Protein backbone atom coordinates (compact mmCIF):
# COMPACT_ATOMS: atom_id res chain seq x y z
CA UNK A 1 0.00 0.00 0.00
CA UNK A 2 1.15 3.50 -0.73
CA UNK A 3 2.52 5.60 2.11
CA UNK A 4 1.21 8.87 0.75
CA UNK A 5 -1.44 9.33 3.43
CA UNK A 6 1.13 9.07 6.22
CA UNK A 7 3.50 11.43 4.42
CA UNK A 8 0.70 13.95 3.87
CA UNK A 9 -0.59 13.78 7.44
CA UNK A 10 2.93 14.06 8.88
CA UNK A 11 3.15 17.45 7.17
CA UNK A 12 -0.35 18.57 8.17
CA UNK A 13 -1.48 18.91 4.56
CA UNK A 14 -4.90 18.16 3.13
CA UNK A 15 -5.72 16.16 0.01
CA UNK A 16 -6.58 19.25 -2.04
CA UNK A 17 -3.13 20.74 -1.40
CA UNK A 18 -1.35 17.59 -2.57
CA UNK A 19 -3.71 17.17 -5.52
CA UNK A 20 -2.69 20.62 -6.73
CA UNK A 21 1.01 19.69 -6.48
CA UNK A 22 0.56 16.56 -8.60
CA UNK A 23 -1.83 18.29 -11.02
CA UNK A 24 -4.98 16.31 -10.33
CA UNK A 25 -8.28 16.74 -8.54
CA UNK A 26 -8.84 16.12 -4.85
CA UNK A 27 -11.28 13.36 -5.78
CA UNK A 28 -8.72 11.57 -7.94
CA UNK A 29 -6.02 12.01 -5.31
CA UNK A 30 -8.35 10.50 -2.71
CA UNK A 31 -8.78 7.42 -4.92
CA UNK A 32 -5.01 7.09 -5.22
CA UNK A 33 -4.51 7.51 -1.49
CA UNK A 34 -7.13 4.88 -0.65
CA UNK A 35 -5.86 2.41 -3.25
CA UNK A 36 -8.95 2.63 -5.46
CA UNK A 37 -6.86 3.97 -8.32
CA UNK A 38 -3.25 3.40 -9.35
CA UNK A 39 -0.75 6.23 -9.34
CA UNK A 40 0.96 7.14 -12.60
CA UNK A 41 4.72 7.26 -12.86
CA UNK A 42 4.58 11.02 -13.41
CA UNK A 43 2.53 11.64 -10.27
CA UNK A 44 4.70 9.24 -8.27
CA UNK A 45 7.80 11.21 -9.30
CA UNK A 46 6.14 14.50 -8.33
CA UNK A 47 5.26 13.13 -4.89
CA UNK A 48 8.74 11.68 -4.35
CA UNK A 49 10.29 15.01 -5.25
CA UNK A 50 7.86 16.97 -3.05
CA UNK A 51 8.35 14.72 -0.01
CA UNK A 52 12.07 14.22 -0.75
CA UNK A 53 11.82 10.44 -0.50
CA UNK A 54 12.32 7.63 -3.00
CA UNK A 55 9.49 6.27 -5.10
CA UNK A 56 10.28 2.86 -3.59
CA UNK A 57 9.53 4.26 -0.12
CA UNK A 58 6.19 5.69 -1.28
CA UNK A 59 5.26 2.36 -2.86
CA UNK A 60 6.23 0.43 0.26
CA UNK A 61 9.04 -1.46 -1.46
CA UNK A 62 11.57 -0.31 1.13
CA UNK A 63 11.41 0.89 4.71
CA UNK A 64 14.47 3.09 4.28
CA UNK A 65 13.46 6.72 4.36
CA UNK A 66 16.24 7.93 2.09
CA UNK A 67 16.08 11.47 0.79
CA UNK A 68 16.48 11.94 -2.94
CA UNK A 69 19.94 12.94 -4.09
Regions found by a protein language model. Give the residues of each.
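A short, Lys/Arg-rich alpha-helix, primarily the initiator
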Residues: 1-10
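Short, charged recognition helix plus adjacent turn
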Residues: 10, 49, 59-69
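Short alpha-helical DNA-recognition segment
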Residues: 12-31
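DNA major-groove recognition helix of helix-turn-helix/homeodomain DNA-binding modules
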Residues: 23, 42-57
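Short, basic-rich loop-to-helix N-cap that marks the start of a DNA-contacting helix
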Residues: 36-46, 65
